[in-house]
């Protein structure tokens, strides 16, 4: 995107933070205004994460102005808020390509820029990595500083507190900035708070406060106020400062995160402080664009839109997403069973649980960004006779793997996992692709795993998992619109026979064993090859009798899945064939052994040879 020098006279001159640091402070507020407008214009034309970045404009400018990046380490947690950072670090002209195939990564990425110290995408990793970098920097003795920026949602995760507990123990020189955008924690910002912040951020106060009131009163003026601050330091601004102080941090704040000069002043004071520092800033998600300020959840991630209209485009598609199918089913069964408990780790809207949360608030739990807790919480409910359903993205279930094994599967508890975003998710790239779940779940004893091929099967499999009371079960479905199927059949729900596949097309010589929503593409290929097509439905347990029959009556078997080939559903078929000494060649088609970058779902599937044309070519090449 071309940066018009007339519209952006200051931003247009800045290609690196070094150039930013050459500006006088008088220009910083104007730069922030230009950067905010540039972000609005670029995201409206390209789509992407929006509201978070609007809220971190001033912080981004202040950090790159005060700290000597990239020599100093600057880490963004998750990365939703890092678009302004990308714009200021040499990627302004490519920002329009973000989240597109061969474009900028959706989150900070080490392969993309030396300013991206840590590749991110999942939450709450910044402080752990930052502490490692801070300790390494201390051993270098070059004066390098480390800063971690984390949001009020991400800081609720256990990993963040584990890292802060360690950082407080090591006393390393590390600055954590809490970007509190009023979506979770909130504190008032006022004149007294600002005055306290100035005192707390001064080096002399940081050095001397350990000796408490006597030294503070002797050294600093306004004795009465300082005595009060000294007495109340551990309770300053309520529980926030008390908690972080007890973890070993020097708590500073809260600070107005939209006053760039105030941030520069405070960061300069903090930069050379010794030990772990905690700066609490208050920002407004969507700041500077009124529609995003009023509804930051809606404007968190956006399609292309017209900024002047103040509204997002309305889709008129009659199609329904798999997430919505799950939400509809959840409401359908909850109407008859008050022991159903729906659980999500901070993904209510994305998982299709908004209506359920409104209709059945006593049966709904958003546990925040706490995947491990979500799973073990579900285990406790199951032990007590309730029917927990954990709605979770495939990529985030990875974070709770031990809990799935230790707390659910070993105890054989009836917990249903509704695993959303299985397979290719598209624009969010390699950190969010659901490439591994069939592999990492299939090896767990006691686990039932189902892969629906359409909306109807999705509902019936969810119901089957809900009614299965002998252990844990998984229904795994992709992002995006569902293949409709015959949804009229699901007005009266019924269970599917366990481990039974369905032959969708009878053919000769070649049998295609499909797992999941690539069935339509598989059907096109099967018709062209006159092959038998089977909707296997169950990854575990497999329909072993059907596999034996197919092996007996065909010359080759093809397995097809939107999961990594290594350890996936096809591997399960291979294992069964070898164990039973069935003499038939098998081709496994699925995701390759590398991390898959961003792009649209259709672009990626085509590139990987998982559309109809690609599947056909793979089979023909292998046979001949």
Curated annotation (Swiss-Prot):
Cysteines paired by S-S bonds: none
GO MF annotation, one: magnesium ion binding
Keyword terms, alphabetized: Isoprene biosynthesis, Magnesium, Metal-binding, Thiamine biosynthesis, Thiamine pyrophosphate, Transferase
Required co-factors: Mg(2+); thiamine diphosphate
Chain positions recorded as thiamine diphosphate binding sites: 80, 121-123, 153-154, 181, 289, 371
Record InterPro entries: Dxylulose-5-P_synthase (IPR005477), THDP-binding (IPR029061), Transketo_C/PFOR_II (IPR009014), Transketolase-like_Pyr-bd (IPR005475), Transketolase_BS (IPR020826), Transketolase_C (IPR033248), Transketolase_CS (IPR049557)
Cofactor note: Binds 1 Mg(2+) ion per subunit.
Biological processes, Gene Ontology terms: 1-deoxy-D-xylulose 5-phosphate biosynthetic process; isopentenyl diphosphate biosynthetic process, methylerythritol 4-phosphate pathway; terpenoid biosynthetic process; thiamine biosynthetic process
Pathway as given in its UniProt record: Metabolic intermediate biosynthesis; 1-deoxy-D-xylulose 5-phosphate biosynthesis; 1-deoxy-D-xylulose 5-phosphate from D-glyceraldehyde 3-phosphate and pyruvate: step 1/1
GO cellular component terms attached to this protein's record: cytosol
Catalytic activity, EC: 2.2.1.7
Gene3D superfamilies: 3.40.50.920, 3.40.50.970
Reactions accelerated catalytically: D-glyceraldehyde 3-phosphate + pyruvate + H(+) = 1-deoxy-D-xylulose 5-phosphate + CO2
Residues reported to bind Mg(2+): 152, 181
Function: Catalyzes the acyloin condensation reaction between C atoms 2 and 3 of pyruvate and glyceraldehyde 3-phosphate to yield 1-deoxy-D-xylulose-5-phosphate (DXP).
Cited HAMAP family: DXP_synth
Family: Belongs to the transketolase family. DXPS subfamily.
Subunit structure: Homodimer.
Protein name: 1-deoxy-D-xylulose-5-phosphate synthase
Organism the protein comes from: Blochmanniella pennsylvanica (strain BPEN)
Name of the gene: dxs
